Amino acid sequence: MTAKLSKALDNNISIKHQIHFPANYNISDMDLCSLISNLLDNAIEANCKLDMTKRRLQIEIKPYNNMLLLFISNSSNGIYLYGGNGNLLTTKTSNKNEHGIGIKRINEIVKKYNGIIEFDPATEIFSVSILFPLDN
């Protein structure tokens, strides 16, 4: 996560974060790193399409009602790419066959751990909320 936050700062993205991992989350470190890495890559990509004065990133990772909440919100130009099935795609590559790979991986991890995900693609802000059940 440190490398991604450094990349965001290098790209003049203003960052607000609140990060607190409870002891009783049950997501493997590898899956958690993959999930956060993909989310931050998408947020940084979206911000880099904007004027430097509009670049914002908000990260919240914390316990919430017996769940682990991951919330990522970033500035956006409001232009989104959707696949034939209506799913959001990312555009980090010019190869159309590779669009949406990160989002596919995010969805796989959420499903693997019985989580819930919600994408909110708005005009100036894009946000992702993910909830995972915590162990008792």
Task: Identify what each model region corresponds to.
Residues 15-35:
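Conserved short strand/loop->alpha-helix "switch" segment adjacent to the catalytic nucleotide/phosphoryl-transfer site
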Residues 66-100:
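Glycine-rich/acidic phosphate-handling loop/turn and adjacent ATP-lid/helix
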